[in-house]
């Protein structure tokens, strides 16, 4: 199984470490040819406006979007969630997204870097529940609204939606890769494995 990590900026190495610890073969994705033969891709956290600009600069945005539309499994964290969203409450000037995930997202919903925090979050999808996932919220977004094809899979005690699934897309506001809690990475890899088996 070959899975990619969009390696334009942000928390690339942490996701590579998680995936490789779980036995996946990984590839850094920077240009369109890096997408060839992937069975899944991670869009990591970082700075969503920089991610957008670099993806367009390296001509990877459009082929990536096309593959996701065609069903390529995606796991996105923090800025990755923002980058997939159809709508942003508070976009930066000129900011573009892939507009693939039917959600409204508020950037930096908890404030600045100083207001970053760690907590635990219960995550549920594909018939499984992962209690107490160790989650790092770093200038994190939240989902303020979502369409009928989107399922909320994680929320904070105050009701803020911090994880969603839409078909082949799983997106979280937080960073499990920063905490060493790799259960969601493993569950995502399991979903890819099931998809591959069905395709055989």
From Swiss-Prot:
Active-site positions on this chain: 78, 175, 177
- Keywords assigned: Glutamine amidotransferase, Hydrolase, Lyase, Pyridoxal phosphate
User: Could you state one GO cellular component term attached to this entry?
Assistant: cytosol
An MF annotation (GO) of this entry: pyridoxal 5'-phosphate synthase (glutamine hydrolysing) activity
Question: Which EC numbers does the record give?
Answer: 4.3.3.6, 3.5.1.2
Q: In which pathway does it act?
A: Cofactor biosynthesis; pyridoxal 5'-phosphate biosynthesis
Q: What InterPro entries is this protein classified in?
A: Class_I_gatase-like, PdxT/SNO, PdxT/SNO_CS
Task: Identify the residues that bind L-glutamine.
Answer: 46-48, 107, 138-139
Substrates-to-products reaction catalysed: aldehydo-D-ribose 5-phosphate + D-glyceraldehyde 3-phosphate + L-glutamine = pyridoxal 5'-phosphate + L-glutamate + phosphate + 3 H2O + H(+); L-glutamine + H2O = L-glutamate + NH4(+)
Tell me the Gene Ontology biological-process terms attached to this UniProt entry: glutamine catabolic process; pyridoxal phosphate biosynthetic process; pyridoxine metabolic process
State how it assembles. In the presence of PdxS, forms a dodecamer of heterodimers. Only shows activity in the heterodimer.
User: Family, per the entry?
Assistant: Belongs to the glutaminase PdxT/SNO family.
Function of the molecule: Catalyzes the hydrolysis of glutamine to glutamate and ammonia as part of the biosynthesis of pyridoxal 5'-phosphate. The resulting ammonia molecule is channeled to the active site of PdxS.
The name this protein goes by in its record:
Pyridoxal 5'-phosphate synthase subunit PdxT
